[in-house]
A protein has these predicted regions:
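Acyl-donor binding region in acyl/amide transferases
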Residues: 1-25, 143-206
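N-proximal short alpha-helices
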Residues: 59, 82, 163-164, 221
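Broad hydrophobic/π-residue packing in well-ordered secondary structure
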Residues: 34-37, 44, 86-87, 104, ...
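C-terminal catalytic domain of photolyase/cryptochrome flavoproteins
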Residues: 87-88, 97, 184-248
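A conserved beta-strand-loop-helix scaffold within acyl/acetyltransferase catalytic domains
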Residues: 2-157, 213, 238-248
């Protein structure tokens, strides 16, 4: 099995696949959600001031529910006692997502902390001294890439845990002076509620067996998540921004 994953529109291999590698099938799973960070956002308060009233009120409520959450930045040493629980939290989210092209090795995060500490970060979120969530990220120049997250789903509703994770990722991106944050796929609607917009990424797949390769498109179509969500436009000047992928 050969896979080329997550190429943006400008780097599509459509012509190359048609003439050079015709066995490769082009497909999309879900768009990635990207938020451009404005130059006048020096804090989360600055970001909130750019929101329409109802989204600003909602954000304050989310932050209020998350006041009891404490986070600790990890390095390769203090992470070791939490390695197993972090992987379990990741698996909870991964299994719930349904469709995954990859499955992480249990040592994945430890390895990144050991060898990529300048560009990779991971923070564990505690509630009443119990680790209930984590988020990770990669700093790629001026782009802040939200990486894998995990959380105890039973805490999500009462603490708005997932929404708080998104806001903490945003706060961290502002702190490191990033120009955009890539929130990745899944949970498209709630990510749009913090201002992210959809951008398609293209993947390519081929199998060495011609028989299997012939049914790959049908399998992928069956496994593809349903694209049923409403694009939110939280900013005061949202009507001035037009993205062809946005839904009304």
């Amino acid at each position: 099995m050969f896979i080329v994953k997550d190429l943006p529109q400008l780097d599509r291999l459509k012509g190359l696949c048609a003439y050079t590698f015709p066995s490769f099938y082009e497909f999309t799973i879900q768009p990635t959600m990207v938020l451009k960070l404005r130059s006048d956002w020096n804090s989360l308060d600055d970001y909130m001031n750019s929101l329409q009233s109802k989204y600003r009120v909602k954000t304050r409520k989310v932050l209020k529910l998350g006041e009891g959450l404490e986070e600790v930045a990890m390095d390769s040493f203090n992470f070791q006692p939490y390695k197993s629980i972090v992987f379990e939290l990741y698996q909870q989210v991964s299994i719930a997502a349904g469709f995954n092209l990859i499955e992480l090795h249990p040592d994945y995060f430890q390895t990144l902390l050991e060898h990529c500490s300048d560009n990779f970060g991971l923070k564990i979120i505690f509630y009443q001294s119990k680790p209930i969530a984590f988020y990770s990220y990669i700093i790629d120049g001026e782009v802040f890439q939200a990486h894998f997250i995990g959380y105890e789903r039973s805490y999500n509703n009462n603490l708005e845990l997932y929404h708080n994770i998104l806001l903490r990722l945003l706060q961290t991106a502002i702190n490191v002076k990033a120009k955009e944050i890539n929130f990745a796929r899944t949970a498209l609607e709630i990510k749009s509620s913090v201002g992210a917009e959809p951008h398609d990424l293209f993947c390519y797949i081929a199998h060495k067996s011609k028989i299997i390769n012939s049914v790959v498109p049908h399998i992928l179509e069956f496994l593809k998540p349903k694209d049923d969500w409403i694009q939110r436009r939280p900013f005061k000047d949202s009507n001035l921004v037009v993205n062809p992928l946005l839904k009304s």
